[in-house]
Every structure is written in C-alpha cells, then in structure tokens.
C-alpha cells in the first residue's frame, strides 16, 4: 500500500464558466511534486477527458496556474474555447482539497486477468477558504481504475466490494463537491438517467 498526501487547488472564472462547461482545472501537490490537470466530461458518466502536466518540485511554493500548458491536446483545446467564450476572464481559486490517498493494485482472477488500482481517499473539500463563508465537506471514497485487462474484471471487483462493504457507485468528483459547496447545495436536482455505454 502506498500512502500519498494530495493537496489540490481548483480554478475557474468568477462566473464558473469551466464548471458550467463540465471542466475542471487544478493544481495538485502530490507528495513533493506539483501536477497541473485539466479534465472534462466525455461521452458518458464513466468517460472523462484528461491531460496532466508534471511541474516537478518547486521548493514548496505553489506554481501559477497556466492554461497554456494544455495547448494542443483535445481537452486543452476545449479549455481554450471555454476561456475564450468567457472573454478570457481571469482564473481564480474556487475551492481546495486536502486528501490522504492509499493506493494498491489488485489482480482480478478470471477471464481477462484485469489489474485494478484501488485508491482510498480520505480528507476534505473546502470552499470559500479564509472567508466568513468558509465551509467544508468530508471525503471518504474508493476509486477503482482499470490499469490493464478486461473491463469486466473492474466491474466484477466493484460489484463484489459494494456487496461486501456497503459501498455505492457515484460519479460525483471532488471538484463537483466543491461546486456544490460554493452554491450551498447538499444535492443537485435529479436528472433522468440514460442507459450507460461502455467502451
């Protein structure tokens, strides 16, 4: 089991243009290294576009956010369009997270011989930091990611763990939790579900 402290800062325009477009732009300290990431919704709830830029160790100081680091990638182009549509409004820190992550690779027996990374995240999401409106929400989630093999191995492992440990499936990201905190929403309005499409 590998233990890592993850401290992330999430950026958006003041009117939350990126969130409205299903995008997240963050700087995250992973141990001693900084990584800038942009994510966007994909074709379905299980598919996300993502691009990471390793910024290395910066002597403890947080580097400045720079959307240009993602230029020339599909999600970077989408980010550039969203920012241009906002009139190139400045990016501001909207929320942050402080998480301890425990990771382990699990080999799933059976057809396909899948290897799944299990990541247990425990910590908090904070919105309005340093203001009278500061609020936080606890995080305790288990993320499963297929590293190689058949997706059925991942589904089988998720089903087994949900049955044995009372877990439930959620597509709500830490960034979305922060957006809900900013809006003072416990839950979002219900939407009609669509049949999932698996790759």
Model-identified regions with their sequence ranges:
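Phosphate-end processing signature that detects enzymes handling 5′-triphosphorylated RNA
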Residues: 1-199
